Structure formats: structure tokens, C-alpha cells
């Protein structure tokens, strides 16, 4: 069929239907959302859980949510800006931080449901494929599905780092190794060692060593926060190992105490009747004194 010019007449505007608001804003892929949200009809009121991962300029957000008519309900959430509490003070948006955030989310969720002792996940980080299976006589493994949003799901994306962290933390999420760093599309082989290096931040450490040798100024500029916090390339692996152990030890979110705000009043408060009468009496007395002084002089 050839090119057909759209005639924008009265009928066109009368029948025009706008897309959903979040589609117009470019925030939601409804084609993907429909498939992530719709539950099997024979499961009735059982929620279909999604693991939502969003990467911003300075943070990584991981949430477990399910859909309702009123809107999505968040069951549990973890953020990369919580990682300094566990010893990771720098590089809060890299692949290793994404893994830590996913691990924190999984441990926090299982702790909330009292399943953290049943499903320990993969304690030793190998980078290899691992799947959580339900244990007989115990509650089934918590199953959810990855919601990557509008992120381009290329091999090595940080979204899959968070996924791997959640799976190693004890959540059952369907996945394959094809999108993890270390997968070679030509040979169709997956290198767990390469993936482990990314989880432990060794790719960043190698680049730091390269910059120290090649361009000292570029190193000082790009890794200023690492220098400020005394983080060297040789410390990286140990830092992440300690962080993983600390997350498993205490994944619970601690609420910050509310600050008591003293309200400032910018206008004068209204006077009571007694104050008003007193003010009038003072003005009268002042006026009479002034009159007396004038008469004496």
C-alpha cells in the first residue's frame, strides 16, 4: 500500500483517542506491563509479584510489587543509597552495587516473611548459574518476575546484576545466563569467572590500575570519591565480600527518628479580651499623664 496522507478533518478529531498518560509521558511500556501483570485465571486472588529495577544517575532502586486496580502495591524495597551502612561508600551505581542492592532486597523480603532461614540462597559468590527450588514440607520459594521497565536489556546491563543478587539472596526468578557479563554470543558460552569479577567490582579495579599507570590526572578526576574514602583497587573484592556478609547478617530497614520541628510564627498572635482591655487602660493612662505634663508646663 502506498503513502496515504492523514486527513485531519472534523471526523479525525472527533474520533481521536489519546494514549494512556504514562505512555504519553514515555514512562511505561504497556505491551510489557500487560504480560507482567496479568495473572493466570485459575489462581484467583493470588498476586503476581514483579521485581522492579530502575537505575538512576545516582541510585539503584529495587522493589517487589504487585498490581491492583488502585495502583501497584509495594511489598518491599531496597536502594543503593543504603549500601554505605554495609561498608560500600563509593560506586553506588555500578554492577557490583546493583548486585548488592538485589541481595539486600531478597534478604529483607525473606526476613519479613520469616523465610530467611529456609532459603539462604547462594552464600559463596561464584557468578555461575543458580536457581532457587522449593523445599518439601516448607513454604514454597518466593517467585517473582523481572520488570526492567524501559531499560535496554543488553548483555551486561546492571538490571541483571540486581537480578543475580536477588536470586543468590533466595528469590526464585526465571532467567538465563545469556544476559550476564561473561556470555559470548558468538561461541554461545558463559564464563562464570568473568561474571564473578563484575560482581566483586574487579572490572572497576582493573580500570583504576590502568588509569593510575596511564593517566594520573584522569584517575584523580574520575575516582575522586574513591581517593577521598581511601578505597584502592586491591581493597575492592574484600569490601564487597564484607558487604555481602553484612547484608545477610542484618537486612532490616531501620527507620530514621523523626526530627521535631519547632514551628516559627511570622505574624503576631491575636490578643485576648483581657489583653485588649489592659492595652486600652495603658493608653488612657499614658494620654492623661501627657495632658497633665502639658498643663503643668
Swiss-Prot record:
Write down the CDD domains for this protein, in alphabetical order. Ribosomal_L18_L5e
Q: List N6-acetyllysine occurrences by residue.
A: 5, 48, 220
Q: Where does this one sit in the cell?
A: Cytoplasm; Nucleus, Nucleolus
Pfam families assigned: Ribosomal_L18_c, Ribosomal_L5e
Tell me a GO biological process for this protein.
ribosomal large subunit assembly
- Carrying Phosphoserine, the residues are 185, 272
Residues found modified as N-acetylglycine: 2
Single Gene Ontology MF annotation = structural constituent of ribosome
The PTM Phosphothreonine maps to 232
Q: Where is this region: Disordered?
A: 252-297
Does the record carry Acetylation as a key word?
Answer: yes
Record cross-link Glycyl lysine isopeptide (Lys-Gly) (interchain with G-Cter in SUMO1), residues: 220
Q: Where is this cross-link: Glycyl lysine isopeptide (Lys-Gly) (interchain with G-Cter in SUMO2)?
A: 220
Q: State what protein this is by name.
A: Large ribosomal subunit protein uL18
Amino acid at each position: 500500500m502506498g503513502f496515504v496522507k492523514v486527513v485531519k478533518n472534523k471526523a479525525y478529531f472527533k474520533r481521536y483517542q489519546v494514549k494512556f498518560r504514562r505512555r504519553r509521558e514515555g514512562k511505561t511500556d504497556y505491551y510489557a506491563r500487560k504480560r507482567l501483570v496479568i495473572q493466570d485465571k485459575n489462581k484467583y486472588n493470588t498476586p503476581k509479584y514483579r521485581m522492579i529495577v530502575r537505575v538512576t544517575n545516582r541510585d539503584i532502586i529495587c522493589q517487589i510489587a504487585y498490581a491492583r486496580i488502585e495502583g501497584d502495591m509495594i511489598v518491599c524495597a531496597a536502594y543503593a543509597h543504603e549500601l554505605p551502612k554495609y561498608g560500600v561508600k563509593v560506586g553506588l551505581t555500578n554492577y557490583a552495587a546493583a548486585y548488592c542492592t538485589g541481595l539486600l532486597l531478597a534478604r529483607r523480603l525473606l526476613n519479613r516473611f520469616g523465610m530467611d532461614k529456609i532459603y539462604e540462597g547462594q552464600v559463596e559468590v561464584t557468578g555461575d548459574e543458580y536457581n532457587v527450588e522449593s523445599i518439601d514440607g516448607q513454604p514454597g520459594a518466593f517467585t517473582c518476575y523481572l520488570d526492567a521497565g524501559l531499560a535496554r536489556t543488553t548483555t551486561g546491563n546492571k538490571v541483571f546484576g540486581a537480578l543475580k543478587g536477588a536470586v543468590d539472596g533466595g528469590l526464585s526468578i526465571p532467567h538465563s545466563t545469556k544476559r550476564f557479563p561473561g556470555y559470548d554470543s558468538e561461541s554461545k558460552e558463559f564464563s562464570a569467572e568473568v561474571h564473578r569479577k563484575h560482581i566483586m567490582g574487579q572490572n572497576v579495579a582493573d580500570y583504576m590500575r590502568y588509569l593510575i599507570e596511564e593517566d594520573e590526572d584522569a584517575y584523580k578526576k574520575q575516582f575522586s570519591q574513591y581517593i577521598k574514602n581511601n578505597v584502592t583497587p586491591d581493597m575492592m573484592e574484600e569490601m564487597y565480600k564484607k558487604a555481602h556478609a553484612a547484608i545477610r547478617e542484618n537486612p532490616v530497614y531501620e527507620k530514621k527518628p523523626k526530627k521535631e520541628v519547632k514551628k516559627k510564627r511570622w505574624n503576631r498572635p491575636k490578643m485576648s479580651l483581657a489583653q485588649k482591655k489592659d492595652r486600652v487602660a495603658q493608653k488612657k493612662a499614658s494620654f492623661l499623664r501627657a495632658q497633665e505634663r502639658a498643663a503643668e508646663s
